[in-house]
Every structure is written in C-alpha cells, then in structure tokens.
Amino acid sequence: RLAHVAYRLGPGSELLAAPLPPALRGGLMVLSDWDCPPVEEPDRLARQIARTCLRRGYAGAAANFDPPARPDRLALLEELSPLLASCGRTLYVPEHCPVAGATILLCTALSGGTLEDRLTQAVDQYGAEHLALDLQRLAMDFPLPCPGGQGTPLTLPQLEALAAGRPTFYSDALCARYFTLTRQGQTHFVLFDDARTLRRKLELARQLGIRDALVMLPEVEDLLEPLFAGER
C-alpha cells in the first residue's frame, strides 16, 4: 500500500495537512505527532481523521507516533480504531502503541540482528494476520565503532555522492546493501536500501504469512516502478 506522508496532529486537536492534489484518491494517510501538544479532544480528532479517509478514499490511517507511548496518543488511537473499522478502514500503529483492532507496523530498517528473526518473533507474538511491514527506505551512515547503534540519516543525494565509485555489498541478514569508506581517519559503514532489497523484505514477510506492507510517499517515489514490477 502507498502511504501519503502529509498529515500531522496539530494544536487544538486539529488535523493538519500538507497540500495534496485535489484529485488524489486511495492509499493510506500517515499521521505524524511531531511537535504536537497533548490531544485534548481525541474523539473529535478521530472523527476528523475518519472523515478525511472517507473523502479521499484512503484504505486507512497509519500512526507514525514517536516513542514512548503517551496517554493522549493512545486515547486517540483507541477512539480511532473502532471508528475506522466501522467504515471498512484499517488503523496501523507502531509496536509501542498497540490498541485493540489495529494492525501493528514492523519497521524493516534494521542495523543489527537479522530481519528474519525480527519478523519471526513478531509473528509468534502477535500473529501474522495482525502485522504489516513498515517498509522504510534505509539510508544510514554509521561511524565505526558505533556502540550505541545510532547512525546519521542520509538524503538520497548524500547517499549517491558517498556511493559513487565504491563497490557495494549485500547483507542477507539485514536484507540491505552496504559499503564502507574512510573519512578524516575514521571508518564508516553505510547501510541502504534499493528496490531489490525492499522487494526481498516483502518476499521474506510473505513467506512468514505477513501479507500487508506500507511504503511511504515521497520516500520511495523514484523506486515505484522497479519495486512493484510484476505486482499488477
């Protein structure tokens, strides 16, 4: 499913939206809570979101809420889940915000462990029918050593500039590509996704029974054709 990263929670329990083409229909709406004050009227905001889903023909809404879970955010999701279900829509939530009736999103942008173990553990815990992939496009620069495991996000032009002329390799454990470089005497490990790695993540999820996945627009706009080749 294509997800439109264009909505956020605003002051006064209002739904704010970036400009979208009036004729845009279908896909999912992504709800960000970045820099949002407490939601004081979750029922009213939930109704706004549901109305927008119906007006735009969205199949549902995905909550892109930062951890940790906050009581006001959970209250909104608890109002929204049955409201969307009554309209034949789906609510997608991050693992730290589980609510009854919602589908849990699993982020596939890993920097350690294995993706197969991650998905298998989630299937065992929640059941494949309650899961969907959050197919984030990974592009991260990790200085080595990196004890905290936190890298620096890269834009696509930055990634392309760093990768130019360098051999890249595939990590089967992470289902991602990588290369190394040395800058100012320090070694860097750059991990990234392309259409092939994202497709491999989809294939692995399907093997485990996870049939639903979200890709974000405009994040993967340049990969849509190779990513979904043969899907129609």
Outline where the language-model segments fall:
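Chitinase-like catalytic core of GlcNAc-active glycosidases
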Residues: 1-114
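Short catalytic/ligand-binding loop motif for oxyanion handling, primarily in non-cytosolic enzymes
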Residues: 11, 140-144, 221-224
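A structural motif corresponding to the C-terminal end of an alpha-helix
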Residues: 55-58, 83-91, 122-130, 200-212
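A structural signal for short, well-ordered beta-strand segments and their strand-loop junctions
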Residues: 62-64, 91-95, 130-136, 214-216
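A cross-taxonomic marker for long C-terminal extensions/tails that follow the last structured domain
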Residues: 99-103, 108-116, 127, 131-141
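Glycan-binding loop/region signatures in secreted carbohydrate-active enzymes
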Residues: 128-201
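Acidic/aromatic/glycine-rich contiguous surface patches that form carbohydrate-binding/processing clefts
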Residues: 201-232
